[in-house]
């Protein structure tokens, strides 16, 4: 007889190799055929809603690692929620207006000057849709489950119509106004920028100290003094109309040779050192407030420079006397407005100085620095010129420096509802908790929101102008424009004349001749995506406002989190979200930012083509995503190793359940042995721990718990000793069926627990599980932890056994290294445990030699009775010897019972019995 044919070895069709790059696309096709998204919505219908609202990625180019991290995190949450009593619809979105698309078309050779705005916008829309399609396929390849056939896209007519309504609501409440104000202005984009569209980079600038002679001392000064200002933007000096001092600071009149200068007393030493003054003496001090309304002369123009009080003046740098140009700075503007100064801005859209800067007209602002500095030197006003490198705002798209420039713009007044914004921030749950402080400070400190852009590709600002210049925004015009956009899209604004965009028969007292013109500016793209709570959450039947969660990168505190909050609070008085979760950026393996120049860019597509989507997803679950995260080939290799371990665990479980029918073979919990029940306790602990981790969005805890369970609880312990019973005993042996019952519970629970993270693998495992009826594991719920009555006692006892077992394993390892034994089944062990451990061992009814995977086990005396040369460990001394007897051909155990049964002379007594009872006819 061939004894190896009597062993019940694992049998399964489930493949050992994942081959994910090939297998996943096939699985995704299967999902598409069975309409998995709709099936899940049907399955969870009627449950309470959980809405994770997708912040729309920008529709341009392939998805990068940041996109992958973001979408996969969202998918974890949505999948988990749909398996824990919620209906969790997920509608993906795209942000599709804005400058990058205009630039992409220009780069493709589109000659926009040769076509109408409407024609150019049509090309922009076509391009945007192509990009949406491209990104949609890449997101699907990640295994993200979403309503891919019905996404929201910001350029769609229904969306634009709702955005117009949001604008109209804000205007009606008095939150929208037009004003002349310095805004971030990008000469390279020729447009105003929002705070979210700027980034800081190092820039080399001139650093100059300039003297402004006093013209009128107002009886505080004698008139022969000079104010000293410091600036790094000499090009703004033609726009200087004043000097700001702090009311509470003390100022010194300093005599240097024959000159007298005015500076803040605190800065005397620094300025004296910088300007290399020798023998400088303070002749008088005055309070800043006393200098108010004194007048200085502009250094090279025949005009006054008014001295004003401003709280923005600091002693961090400079002289305490601040050059003030209301057309070129937020603080300057505020102070200038208070003192009735005009808003002078002698720089045009392209960043070129105009004829309001005589002597420098026609120069690009940056190129004007040198001639202006030379002019200052010529008139004797330049006290010092050096160059510094400092952090300076740049256009996030063109990467070029920006300027502050006063222009006529449309604004949303944040001031008008700042209090409500701050309250809304406090009512929201922030993860990480510092998110609250971050957004609170932004909302507290931010100025009014400049919402107009001088571009073509975007949603038009729905304002008309009467003949007398009055802006027209009424319920009637807003509703009419919204209806037109819903029917024709926003391009209708550029295709029709103003009168054809107004309601029929519309009249206005400011237009006696019935003539009107329309606004040509478009809205900031942050107003587009920031209106999604109205256009998507409020409009779609399957969603609701506020959403339960917004989840984006930490750059969105100043972006989408902020703009969504502003429009939602303005329109509804409440935040659009109950909770906000943010993640960090993806860096390379060394913690560097990814960039083309370094050549360290990791692309999701490459990972999916080489390793598979589930490996990328497993990586996402493994990192501390609330901070910046790292990725590299080495890191992915480690993750792939963990995946292999999880996959092999599934394969082992399936292989050993090939002949198991849960309805016929399952053993009742009460009839299981202690060690099997202990394994169920460990499984229930895992279920509890993993579900708690999912609940708190701690996916790394899920990853580690599952990995540890597979390697430590299963592989190193339970599955290791169970093989002896699973393979050797007869099919229906009670111990074998008991272990299979546990393995079955473990398999079903484990498959469900990994589903949110490894959906392809979980759905690949699912149909192989005996007795399952659901078409997909995604149509099931998370396992429930079953509390065993004696769970605590089992845990105490068997956790103690596991620590003692560790001591035994160490001893066996030493014996192997010293060539006392070959493998552990060659061993005979005698234990000399502590009193506590001895009592525990005596209470175990299971076969201890099976649990230790040795051929012979003996319990000696107490630990202090052990032979002197026996290695002592924390809980026991262990004597390891070669087991006596011969090796059984079937089970490999060393036994003195080999050949006792004459018919099976190469088998031990146990195997001979199993063979006779099960295989001999």
Swiss-Prot record:
- Provide the protein's localization: Cytoplasm
Q: Name one GO cellular component term.
A: cytosol
According to its UniProt record, the EC number is 6.1.1.5
General function of this protein: Catalyzes the attachment of isoleucine to tRNA(Ile). As IleRS can inadvertently accommodate and process structurally similar amino acids such as valine, to avoid such errors it has two additional distinct tRNA(Ile)-dependent editing activities. One activity is designated as 'pretransfer' editing and involves the hydrolysis of activated Val-AMP. The other activity is designated 'posttransfer' editing and involves deacylation of mischarged Val-tRNA(Ile).
Q: What is this protein called?
A: Isoleucine--tRNA ligase 1
Q: How does it assemble?
A: Monomer.
Place the motif 'HIGH' region on the sequence: 57-67
Question: Record's Gene3D superfamilies?
Answer: 1.10.730.20, HUPs, Ile-tRNA synthetase CP2 domain-like, Valyl/Leucyl/Isoleucyl-tRNA synthetase, editing domain
Keyword tRNA processing found: no
InterPro entries (UniProt xref):
aa-tRNA-synth_I_CS, aa-tRNA-synth_Ia, Anticodon_Ile_BEm, Ile-tRNA-ligase, Ile-tRNA-ligase_type1, Ile-tRNA_ligase, M/V/L/I-tRNA-synth_anticd-bd, Rossmann-like_a/b/a_fold
Extent of motif 'KMSKS' region = 593-597
């Amino acid at each position: 007889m061939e004894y190896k044919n009597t062993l019940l070895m694992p049998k399964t069709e489930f493949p050992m190799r994942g081959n994910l790059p090939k297998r996943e696309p096939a699985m995704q096709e299967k999902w598409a055929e069975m309409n998995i998204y709709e099936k899940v919505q049907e399955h969870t219908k009627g449950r309470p809603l959980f809405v994770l609202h997708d912040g729309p990625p920008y529709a341009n180019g392939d998805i990068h690692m940041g996109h992958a991290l973001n979408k996969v995190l969202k998918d974890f949450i949505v999948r988990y929620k749909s398996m824990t009593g919620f209906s969790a619809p997920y509608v993906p979105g795209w942000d599709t207006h804005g400058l990058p698309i205009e630039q992409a078309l220009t780069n493709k050779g589109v000659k926009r000057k040769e076509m109408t705005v409407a024609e150019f916008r049509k090309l922009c829309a076509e391009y945007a849709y192509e990009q949406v399609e491209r990104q949609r396929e890449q997101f699907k390849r990640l295994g993200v489950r979403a309503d891919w056939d019905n996404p929201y896209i910001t350029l769609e007519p229904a969306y634009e119509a709702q955005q117009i309504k949001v604008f109209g609501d804000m205007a009606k409440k008095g939150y929208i106004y037009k004003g002349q104000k310095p805004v971030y202005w990008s000469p390279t984009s020729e447009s105003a920028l929002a705070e979210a569209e700027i980034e800081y980079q190092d820039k080399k600038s001139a650093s100059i100290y300039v003297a402004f002679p006093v013209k009128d001392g107002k009886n505080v000064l004698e008139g022969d003094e000079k104010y000293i200002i410091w600036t790094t933007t000499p090009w703004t000096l033609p726009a200087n109309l004043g000097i700001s001092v702090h009311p509470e600071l003390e100022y010194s009149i300093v005599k240097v040779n024959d000159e007298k200068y005015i500076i803040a007393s605190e800065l005397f030493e620094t300025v004296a050192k910088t300007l290399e003054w020798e023998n400088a003496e303070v002749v008088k001090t005055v309070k800043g407030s006393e200098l108010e309304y004194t007048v200085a002369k502009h250094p090279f123009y025949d005009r006054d420079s008014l001295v004003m009080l401003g709280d923005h003046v600091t002693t961090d740098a400079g002289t305490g006397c601040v050059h003030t140009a209301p057309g070129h700075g937020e603080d300057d503007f505020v102070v200038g407005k208070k003192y009735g100064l005009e808003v002078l801005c002698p720089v045009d859209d392209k960043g070129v100085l105009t004829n309001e800067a005589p002597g420098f007209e026609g120069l690009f602002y940056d190129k004007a620095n040198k001639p202006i500095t030379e002019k200052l030197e010529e008139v004797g006003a330049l006290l010092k010129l050096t160059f510094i490198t400092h952090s300076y705002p740049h256009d996030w798209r063109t990467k070029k420096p920006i300027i502050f420039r006063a222009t006529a713009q449309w604004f949303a007044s944040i001031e008008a509802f700042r209090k409500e914004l701050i309250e809304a921030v406090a009512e929201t749950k922030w993860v990480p908790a510092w998110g609250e402080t971050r957004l609170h400070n932004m909302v507290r400190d931010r100025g009014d929101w400049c919402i107009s852009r001088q571009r073509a590709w975007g949603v038009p600002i729905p304002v008309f102008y009467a003949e007398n210049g009055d802006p027209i925004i009424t319920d009637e015009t807003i509703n009419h424009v919204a209806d037109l956009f819903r029917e024709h899209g926003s391009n209708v604004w550029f295709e029709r004349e103003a009168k054809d965009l107004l309601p029929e028969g519309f009249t206005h007292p400011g237009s006696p001749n019935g003539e009107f013109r329309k606004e040509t500016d478009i809205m900031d793209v942050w107003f587009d995506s920031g209106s999604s709570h109205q256009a998507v959450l409020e409009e779609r039947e399957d969603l609701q406002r506020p959403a339960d969660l917004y989840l984006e990168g930490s750059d969105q505190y100043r972006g989408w989190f902020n703009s969504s909050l502003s429009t939602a609070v303005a329109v509804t008085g409440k935040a659009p979200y109950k909770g906000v979760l943010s993640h960090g950026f993806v860096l390379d393996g060394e913690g560097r930012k990814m960039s083309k120049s370094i050549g360290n860019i990791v692309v999701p597509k490459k990972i999916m083509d080489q390793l598979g989507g589930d490996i990328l997803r497993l990586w996402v679950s493994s990192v501390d995503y609330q901070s910046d995260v790292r990725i590299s080939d080495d890191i992915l290799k480690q993750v792939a190793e963990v995946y292999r371990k999880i996959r092999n665990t599934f394969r082992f479980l399936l292989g050993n359940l090939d002949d198991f029918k849960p309805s016929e073979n399952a053993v009742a919990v009460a009839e299981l042995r202690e060690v099997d029940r202990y394994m169920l306790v460990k499984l229930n602990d895992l279920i509890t721990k993993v579900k708690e981790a999912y609940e708190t969005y701690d996916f790394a805890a899920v990853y580690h718990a599952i990995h540890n369970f597979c390697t430590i609880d299963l592989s190193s312990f339970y599955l290791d000793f169970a093989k002896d019973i699973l393979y050797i005993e007869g099919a229906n042996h009670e111990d074998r069926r008991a272990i299979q019952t546990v393995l079955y519970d473990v398999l079903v629970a484990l498959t469900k627990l990994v589903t949110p993270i490894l959906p392809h693998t979980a759905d690949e495992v699912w149909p192989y599980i005996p007795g399952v009826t659901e078409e997909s594991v995604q149509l099931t719920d998370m396992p429930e932890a079953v509390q065993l009555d004696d769970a605590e006692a089992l845990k105490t006892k068997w956790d103690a056994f596991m620590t003692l077992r560790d001591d035994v394993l160490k001893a066996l390892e030493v014996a192997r290294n010293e060539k006392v034994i070959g493998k552990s089944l060659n061993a005979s062990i005698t234990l000399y445990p502590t009193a506590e451990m001895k009592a525990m061992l005596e209470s175990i009814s299971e076969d201890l030699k099976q649990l230790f995977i040795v051929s012979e086990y003996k319990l000696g005396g107490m630990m202090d009775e052990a032979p002197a040369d026996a290695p002592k460990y924390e809980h026991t001394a262990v004597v390891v010897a070669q087991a006596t007897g011969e090796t059984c051909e079937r089970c490999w155990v060393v036994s003195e019972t080999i050949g006792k049964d004459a018919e099976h002379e190469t088998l031990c007594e146990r195997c001979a019995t199993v063979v006779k009872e099960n295989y001999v006819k």
